[in-house]
């Protein structure tokens, strides 16, 4: 690289040449000239786009990338969404094999040639499953189902017929979910999974109750709704939000129905040499000592920075709750927990104050399954706060839930969420669909069994993510500091940090003055058919971009990195061109 860092050069046949490779197309100085001549200064359109959600902006970027594809005949690379490009195969194979067994059980009950059959019968069904699997003993799915059966019997002494009957009915989907909150054996398996993956094998004493939901998004909706319905949060109350964060956590509190006063606690700590650590300042966190703060919302590991909360921050939060704000309600979204070795959720450290959301979507490649859980300790502050409500509020809630049970005062908050999820009146048909629950069960047991047998699934998953992350940053020419708290599912790249490191403060000020932060994401879409999201939309650094490391191939991140660097260098070249005098080499 030249000392001024404007372009990356190499010598070819005696000529100095700038070169960028993207999408299997190698371009030279002509591409640089195209960037230099494209004066996309701040305009009203970009300012307007800064006000919308990054996920809605993504649709506009895709349109621009599509136009670029038609014009330049290349492939769009969409790194704007966290939908992974992998699937966990064995638990799915087991699901389909279990479906074959369940259909045999239906036909065993009764069958007619018109395409009708009965339903699975409980008596002796576990022995029949054993024979079914024995006949297919060479199939990996059969071996896995046998391990699942043995695990539940050996670890939890469940009744074999009762459990296998639940499994068969689940995969067939012939009944309403009973219990509505989560099925018995599904809850047992997922409780063990959460203890292993979210609590690092050190769960809190007592029972963690689960509510199976239609993905993490449904869990969010149910939590916000029930907190308000049960007067735990009133319109206009003060809450805290740890940022950057998944955009809906920013947008939902602003809705007229909630209109919460939101204080953001930014992950603003920097290293001595000006690099983001993506951790929280103790002074900012100290604001939570004020009991005016009713609730704290966090995604941990974070989205988009993709870092777990540091141990000293967790310790400080524990101290704040124990000494200053014991009624603080915490909602933690831990969907990326499995990407940080040794991760411990706030649910493990502050179990009585915490609602945990966990989705199976990201780890198992299952966004389309819409499978998640809300986890709460049975002894929790939410139930206690309901007990302390004024008599008038309790009377209102008795009227709300009175059609479900006569002793509403003994109805736990988690069960109120179940009822609220179906407008109370439809509580009798509440619950996640049975096929979703059995696939969730198989996902959970797969991770548990795999860990006992060498943890190969997790290790390979981490290897894939880390290779993509390294490729992205190496191709940009930026430095990625080692950090054991990094999940790596996303990468948030603050372009101003690198602009200053490469070109200095004067260039940064010029960039801010002449361009909108969205200019980068628009140019990537328009000029290179790349879709990334603006980090400012997550209340992160204004000039940052979010790249998902989950949904493209390793070679694609090399293309993305080089394209990002090319645009940064093009800004610098234009800045130098604007200076009264530029020194030559």
Question: Which sequence ranges carry the predicted segments?
Answer:
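Conserved glycine-rich beta-strand-loop-beta hairpin in the small C-terminal domain of fold type I
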Residues: 438-447, 454-473, 480-509, 538
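Short, flexible/disordered intra-domain loops and linkers
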Residues: 47-50, 87-95, 174-178, 269-279, ...
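Structural motif of enzymes handling amino- and sulfur-group chemistry
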Residues: 395-464, 472
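Short, solvent-exposed loop/turn segments at secondary-structure junctions
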Residues: 82-87, 217-219, 245-247, 301-305, ...
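PLP-dependent enzyme catalytic core of the Aspartate aminotransferase-like
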Residues: 3, 10, 21, 26-28, ...
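Conserved core of the PLP fold type I
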Residues: 116-325, 337-351, 355, 553
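Active-site PLP attachment segment
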Residues: 85, 347-414
């Amino acid at each position: 690289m030249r000392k001024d860092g404007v372009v990356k050069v190499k010598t070819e046949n005696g000529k100095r040449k700038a070169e960028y490779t993207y999408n299997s197309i190698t371009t030279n100085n002509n591409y640089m000239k195209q960037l230099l001549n494209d004066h996309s200064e701040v305009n009203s359109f970009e300012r307007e786009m800064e006000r919308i959600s990054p996920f809605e902006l993504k649709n506009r970027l895709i349109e621009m990338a599509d136009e670029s594809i038609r014009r330049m005949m290349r492939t769009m690379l969409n790194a704007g969404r966290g939908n992974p490009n992998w699937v966990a195969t064995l638990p799915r194979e087991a699901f389909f094999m279990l479906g074959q067994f369940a259909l045999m059980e239906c036909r065993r009950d009764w069958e007619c040639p018109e395409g009708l059959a009965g339903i699975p019968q409980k008596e002796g069904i576990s022995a029949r499953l054993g024979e079914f699997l024995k006949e297919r003993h060479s199939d990996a799915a059969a071996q896995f189902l046998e391990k699942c059966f043995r695990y539940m019997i050996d670890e939890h002494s469940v009744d074999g017929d009762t459990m296998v009957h639940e499994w068969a009915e689940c995969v067939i989907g012939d009944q309403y979910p009973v219990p509505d909150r989560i099925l018995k054996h599904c809850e047992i398996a997922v409780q063990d999974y959460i203890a292993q993956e979210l609590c690092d094998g050190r769960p809190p004493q007592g029972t963690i109750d689960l509510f199976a939901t239609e993905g993490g998004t449904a869990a969010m909706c149910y939590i916000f709704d029930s907190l308000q319905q049960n007067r735990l949060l009133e319109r206009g109350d003060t809450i805290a939000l740890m940022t950057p964060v998944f955009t809906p956590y920013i947008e939902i509190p602003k809705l007229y129905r909630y209109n919460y006063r939101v204080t953001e606690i930014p992950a603003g700590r920097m290293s001595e040499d000006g690099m983001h650590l993506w951790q929280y300042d103790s002074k900012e966190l100290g604001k939570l000592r004020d009991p005016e703060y009713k609730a704290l919302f966090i995604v941990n590991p974070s989205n988009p920075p993709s870092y777990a909360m540091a141990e000293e921050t967790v310790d400080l939060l524990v101290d704040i709750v124990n000494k200053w704000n014991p009624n603080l309600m915490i909602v933690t979204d831990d969907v990326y927990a499995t990407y940080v070795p040794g991760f411990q959720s706030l649910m493990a450290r502050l179990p009585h104050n915490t609602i945990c959301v966990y989705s199976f979507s990201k780890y198992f490649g299952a966004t389309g399954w819409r499978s998640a859980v809300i986890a709460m300790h049975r002894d929790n502050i939410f139930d206690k706060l309901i007990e302390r409500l004024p008599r008038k509020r309790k009377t209102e809630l008795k009227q709300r839930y009175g059609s479900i049970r006569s002793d509403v005062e003994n109805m736990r908050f988690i069960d109120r969420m179940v009822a609220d999820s179906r407008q109370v009146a439809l509580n009798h048909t509440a619950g996640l669909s049975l096929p979703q629950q059995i696939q969730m069960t198989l996902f959970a047991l797969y991770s548990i069994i795999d860990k006992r047998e060498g943890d190969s699934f997790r290790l390979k998953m981490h290897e894939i993510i880390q290779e993509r992350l390294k490729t992205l940053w190496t191709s940009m020419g930026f430095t990625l500091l080692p950090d054991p708290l990094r999940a790596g599912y996303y990468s948030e790249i603050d372009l101003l940090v690198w602009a200053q490191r490469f070109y200095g403060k004067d260039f940064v000020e010029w960039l801010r003055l002449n361009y909108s932060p969205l200019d980068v994401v628009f140019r990537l879409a328009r000029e290179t058919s790349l879709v990334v999201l603006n980090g400012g939309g997550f209340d992160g650094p204004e000039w940052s971009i979010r790249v998902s490391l989950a949904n493209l191939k390793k070679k694609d991140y090399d293309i993305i990195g080089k394209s990002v660097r090319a645009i940064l260098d093009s800004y610098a070249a234009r800045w130098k061109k604007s200076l009264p005098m530029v020194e030559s080499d």
